[in-house]
A protein has these predicted regions:
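A short acidic, Gly/Pro-enriched loop at the edge of an enzyme's catalytic core
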Residues: 31-43
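A short glycine-rich, Lys/Arg-flanked "PGG" loop and its adjoining helix->strand segment in the class I
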Residues: 51-68
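Class I SAM-dependent methyltransferase SAM/SAH-binding core
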Residues: 1-34
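Short SAM/SAH-binding signature in class I
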Residues: 40-48, 65
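Acceptor-substrate binding/catalytic loop of class I
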Residues: 84-98, 138-141
């Protein structure tokens, strides 16, 4: 099994090692390199990282599974555009439709493909500032000084309405190499 996100690596190593399953930790920029032989993996999981569908196919055994949860292209789009009227999503092609089509074109069987747009609600301006500062791909060039007028508007909305809500964009896939 392969994984790139450290909290998942720790969890998978702890839970799966007891069952004889080897977990391969990948570097952050791994989408074009998996350190295993072609046709050698029973399963590849992916939590939010970019991936190369052809490489996934090459590394999986026939009948192997690819399971991925992704942050879609439109995650927090309205809030990102509020701060930057020229904002364009960093990963505009990361959609369920395109990802499913890419995998089907490579011969994968799609066992599960679901998307969700849950709400995320902010109850104070500090939470918005923190959130925007830790995900620069959705809030490029964000800073309090640069976005002070928008932050003031959002703070007033929170004072009037108790909160500000944005939409997240998520999808999950479970596939099998045929």
């Amino acid at each position: 099994m392969t994984e790139a996100w450290q909290p998942n690596i720790n969890l998978l190593k702890h839970t799966l090692a007891k069952q004889g399953i080897k977990v391969h930790a990948l570097p952050a920029k791994h989408e074009d390199a998996l350190p295993v032989k072609n046709g050698s993996l029973n399963m590849i999981t992916n939590s939010h990282a970019a991936f190369n569908p052809k490489l996934i196919k090459d590394k999986l055994k026939t009948g192997g599974y690819f399971i991925s949860q992704q942050v879609g292209a439109l995650n927090n789009y309205s809030l990102s555009r509020f701060f930057d009227s020229d904002y364009v999503p960093a990963y505009p092609d990361n959609t369920l439709l395109k990802t499913v089509a890419d995998l089907q074109n490579l011969g994968f069987e799609i066992l599960l493909a679901k998307e969700s747009q849950p709400s995320m609600t902010f109850f104070d301006i500090g939470a918005i500032i923190y959130y925007a500062s830790i995900i620069p791909w959705e809030f490029p060039d964000f800073s309090v000084g640069h976005c002070l007028s928008q932050l003031t508007q959002l703070d007033q909305l929170i004072q009037n309405d108790s909160s500000v809500t944005t939409k997240e964009d998520r999808f999950i896939l479970v596939t099998r190499k045929m």
